[in-house]
Structures are given as structure tokens and as C-alpha cells.
């Protein structure tokens, strides 16, 4: 069968790599059209950019500048004791041609953390499936990218992406480590200590990355620790949970966090609870669309195979609805935190990580549901498997059609009034073909040349017109206000103004 046929598994992984590669290529070509930083990229990287301009690649000075940036924002704006350091290394400080590394900085952690999760789960349930973790990681990465509600903030903008996704990715990896430690009695002593230590490190990094990812990490570890402590007398998740709580508190109680939250009109507790509950429910309805159903269909056979593992007892599958309930609570909590502190969920990049939590939670729910059907209700699904086996020649075509559907439709975006648009690789290819990505790049290059002109200490830039604002790549243009004026110190100007601003 497929599950014990290495050649068939290799062919399946190759097909997924081919489809993912073509989609990523369209994204990358579209991304190469945008070669300039934007918005908060300038603010966080002003010190490191100045070091590169004056001293070149002087690593000690760069590290010191990044650390100074980190400390400044920890004390004056946000309690992100890791993220400020990371954001200071915005790739364009070495030259705008390197800004495209953003896509790599986002995709690599996401893919390998998904692989880590899949490996921890799959090899515990069926050690013979060495290639299945790779296939699952490729499929999930593809699905998460194509369905991302705000791709410009999650893939194309360094500050927007790197302030959220790497820490969410680490939370995903931490969930895999927590699952592996649920079976600590079957692990060698060294591996148990390694997993526990890795969980602590990941938790501390997540806590210094973003508060919403930190809260997600705490809740997942709390659930795992509670289940293992009650049912197995297993406390190996407790160190990572303690580190996660310490990291989140260090973030929330930072002086900079107090400064930031004071600038927002936060909602009352009860109001935030109700509003976040309603928004979480609305997102469930909004995101249950055809591409997501395609993903769940593609996951049926591998998940069904894993539910038959003798490692898990039947009682694990008694209440499959708990998977959906836990997913909803996690989404609710992730939306509640910014709603309570800032009065709303804010930018679409935050919805990106809520969307990813939703997708992974539904995959876990599907796993529990399949196990419940076979192992609790006694419904045999072998007949359906045999039918699929008889249709083995047609299944690759069906899978390709589903992947194509995910690549062409994706998920709804969060841009107001533009629900008819879908943020997929198809849209990226379209913007390349009609020249809108090129016009956007040319306009930014012209603006960059003006800002880099040492003969002009005072610069006036014009807003982008409608033809220079491609739907997929464009987020917002520069505007008066403190959030936008990292331009002045970044380029060493006396002043930067906007002409004809409306």
C-alpha cells in the first residue's frame, strides 16, 4: 500500500514540491518588483542602516545598534524584547536589492516549524512514515500562504511579517514538542530533557516576539500540561509553560507596552469579550470556503491512517467536538487581547495568525472526527479507502485540481470593500502580466533615488497614484504622522514632506 511504499511516497512529495514551487515562483517574481522597505521598516532599522552606511558590514557595531533599538522600543513603545532586535535587521539596510529576502525569512521558519510539528506527531504515531511529515508540511505551508487574508502584511512587508509569523511558527513547533512530551515515558532521558529545554527557549523567544503569539503559546501549553498532569502524571510540559508565562508577563508589563496601550482607547472587559466572540464566529463562517474544504479533503487519507495507530487509546477520540471548541477558544482569545487593549483587532497581519490557527485547528478536529467514526462509532472506512485505491490513476489529477483551486481562489481578504479579490498566486501572476507590479516598483525606485540624493537635505515626495498601487503588493502610502516618519533619520534628511497630500 501507499503507506509502506517508499517510491509512491516520494512521488507524492515530488508532486507537492512541484505545485508549491510554481506558486512560490509567482510570489517571488511579484515580490522582486518591490525592492524597497516601507513604513515601520524605516523606523526600526534607522540605527542599523546608519551603521552600514558609515562602517559597512561591521558586525559588532550592527549588533550593538540592533540591541539599542531593541532596548529603546522595549522601554518606549512595545515590550517586544526579541522582535525589536530582529526588525532592526531589515534586509534593505544592506541595499534595496536584498529586501526580497523577506519572503525567505517568512517561509523558511513557517515550513520547518510545520515540519517539526508533523514530525513529532507522525513519527510518534507511525515511525514508518518518514516522508509523510515532509508532505504534510509542504501541503500546509501551501494552504496557509494561498489562504492568507492579508498577504501584503504577511509575506511582502518585512516589519509586518516578521513581527508576527516567526513567533507563530515557533508556537506551532512548541505544540509539536508538547505532543512528543505527552509520551515522555517512551522517550530516552536525553531527548526528554532536550525537548523540554527547546520548549523553554521557544517560549521565551515567542514571549519577546508578539503578545498574541505569546498568548496562543501559553494556552496550548496550558492545555497540554493539564491533560498530561491529570491523565498521565506527566509534568514535562510544565517548564515550557512556566517560560511561556514568564515571557508573556515580561512583554505585557514592559514600560513600552504601557506607553503603547495608553495611546489607544481600549474597550471594556465585557465589551471586548462579546465583540471578540462575535468576530471569531464571523471568521469561522467567512473562512469555511471551497479551498479550505479542498485542503481537508487532501488530508483525509493520511489523517485516517494515523488515527489507527495503536499508540493512541480509543478514549482520545470520544469527544471530537472538543477539537473545534478548542480552536474557537484559541481564536477568541487571540482576538480578545488586542480588542481589550487597543479597542479592536487592528491590522490584517494579526488576522493572518488567527487564520493559521483556524486551519491547523480544523485539521486536528478532522483527525479526531475520523478516529471517532472508526474507533468509537465503529463505522468502517476501509471501503472508501479501497475505492480510492482502485481509482489510484485518477487521484493525482483530483489532487492537482484541488491544489489548483487553492492557488486560484485562496481565501477572502481583509481589505474593506474588496471581498471579490483573492490573495493568491494567480493574483500575483496577473499583476506581473498587466504591469501594475512594475509600475509600483518604478515609482518606489524614483522615490528612493530622491531620498538617497545627498545634495537634497530637504525632500518632498509625491503620493502614489492609482496606477501605481497594485492590489496585492500595495498596503498604504506614506502619510503625515509619527508612525511614518522613520524616513527622515533613515535617509539622514533634515525634513521629508509630502506634496499634494489629501
What are these language model-derived features?
Residues 400-480:
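Membrane-embedded, lumen/periplasm-facing catalytic core of multi-pass transferases
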Residues 110-121, 170-182, 218-227, 297-303, ...:
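Transmembrane alpha-helical segments
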Residues 1-27:
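Start-transfer (signal-anchor) and selected internal transmembrane alpha helices
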Residues 180-204, 235-239:
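Short hydrophobic alpha-helices at membrane interfaces in multi-pass membrane enzymes
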Residues 32-101, 158-161, 203, 207-350, ...:
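Transmembrane catalytic cores of multi-pass membrane glycosyltransferases
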Residues 131-182, 210, 333-367:
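Membrane-interface micro-motifs in multi-pass membrane enzymes
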Residues 101-130, 134-135, 173:
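Transmembrane-helix motifs of polytopic, lipid-linked glycan transferases
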Residues 194-196, 245, 318-324, 372-418:
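Signature aromatic-anchored transmembrane alpha helix within multi-pass, membrane-resident enzymes
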Amino acid at each position: 500500500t501507499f503507506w509502506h511504499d517508499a517510491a509512491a511516497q516520494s512521488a507524492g512529495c515530488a508532486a507537492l514540491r512541484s505545485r508549491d514551487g510554481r506558486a512560490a515562483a509567482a510570489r517571488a517574481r511579484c515580490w522582486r518588483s518591490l525592492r524597497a522597505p516601507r513604513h515601520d521598516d524605516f523606523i526600526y532599522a534607522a540605527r542599523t542602516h546608519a551603521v552600514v552606511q558609515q562602517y559597512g558590514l561591521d558586525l559588532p557595531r550592527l549588533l550593538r545598534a540592533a540591541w539599542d533599538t531593541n532596548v529603546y522600543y522595549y522601554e518606549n513603545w512595545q515590550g517586544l524584547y526579541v522582535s525589536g532586535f530582529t526588525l532592526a535587521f531589515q534586509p534593505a539596510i544592506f541595499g534595496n536589492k536584498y529586501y526580497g529576502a523577506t519572503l525567505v525569512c517568512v517561509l523558511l521558519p513557517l515550513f520547518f516549524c510545520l515540519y517539526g510539528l508533523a514530525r513529532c506527531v507522525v513519527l510518534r504515531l507511525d515511525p514508518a512514515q518518514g516522508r509523510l511529515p515532509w508532505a504534510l508540511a509542504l501541503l500546509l505551508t501551501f494552504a496557509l500562504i494561498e489562504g492568507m487574508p492579508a498577504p501584503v502584511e504577511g509575506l511582502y512587508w518585512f516589519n509586518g511579517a516578521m513581527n508576527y509569523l516567526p513567533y507563530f511558527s515557533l508556537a506551532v513547533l512548541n505544540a509539536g514538542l508538547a505532543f512528543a512530551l505527552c509520551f515522555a515515558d517512551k522517550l530516552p532521558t536525553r531527548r526528554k530533557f532536550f525537548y523540554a529545554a527547546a520548549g523553554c527557549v521557544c517560549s521565551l523567544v515567542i514571549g519577546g516576539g508578539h503578545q498574541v503569539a505569546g498568548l496562543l503559546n501559553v494556552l496550548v501549553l496550558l492545555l497540554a500540561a493539564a491533560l498530561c498532569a491529570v491523565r498521565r502524571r506527566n509534568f514535562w510540559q510544565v517548564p515550557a509553560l512556566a517560560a511561556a508565562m514568564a515571557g508573556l508577563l515580561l512583554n505585557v508589563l514592559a514600560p513600552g507596552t504601557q506607553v503603547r496601550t495608553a495611546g489607544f482607547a481600549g474597550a471594556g472587559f465585557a465589551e471586548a469579550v462579546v465583540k471578540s466572540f462575535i468576530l471569531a464566529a464571523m471568521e469561522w463562517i467567512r473562512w469555511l470556503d471551497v479551498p479550505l474544504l479542498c485542503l481537508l479533503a487532501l488530508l483525509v487519507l493520511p489523517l485516517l491512517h494515523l488515527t489507527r495507530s495503536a499508540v493512541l487509546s480509543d478514549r482520545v477520540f470520544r469527544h471530537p467536538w472538543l477539537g473545534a471548541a478548542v480552536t474557537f477558544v484559541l481564536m477568541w482569545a487571540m482576538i480578545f487581547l488586542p480588542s481589550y487593549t487597543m479597542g479592536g483587532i487592528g491590522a490584517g497581519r494579526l488576522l493572518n495568525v488567527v487564520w493559521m490557527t483556524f486551519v491547523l485547528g480544523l485539521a486536528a478536529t478532522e483527525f479526531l472526527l475520523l478516529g471517532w467514526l472508526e474507533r468509537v462509532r465503529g463505522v468502517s472506512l476501509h471501503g472508501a479507502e479501497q475505492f480510492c485505491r482502485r481509482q489510484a490513476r485518477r487521484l493525482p489529477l483530483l489532487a492537482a485540481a484541488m491544489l489548483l483551486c487553492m492557488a486560484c481562489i485562496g481565501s477572502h481578504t481583509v481589505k474593506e470593500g474588496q471581498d471579490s479579490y483573492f490573495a493568491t498566486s494567480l493574483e500575483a501572476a496577473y499583476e506581473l502580466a498587466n504591469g501594475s507590479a512594475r509600475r509600483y516598483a518604478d515609482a518606489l525606485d524614483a522615490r528612493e533615488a530622491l531620498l538617497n540624493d545627498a545634495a537634497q537635505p530637504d525632500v518632498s515626495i509625491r503620493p502614489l497614484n492609482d496606477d501605481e498601487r497594485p492590489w496585492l503588493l500595495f498596503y498604504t502610502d506614506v502619510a503625515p504622522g509619527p508612525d511614518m516618519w522613520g524616513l527622515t533619520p533613515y535617509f539622514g534628511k533634515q525634513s521629508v514632506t509630502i506634496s499634494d497630500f489629501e
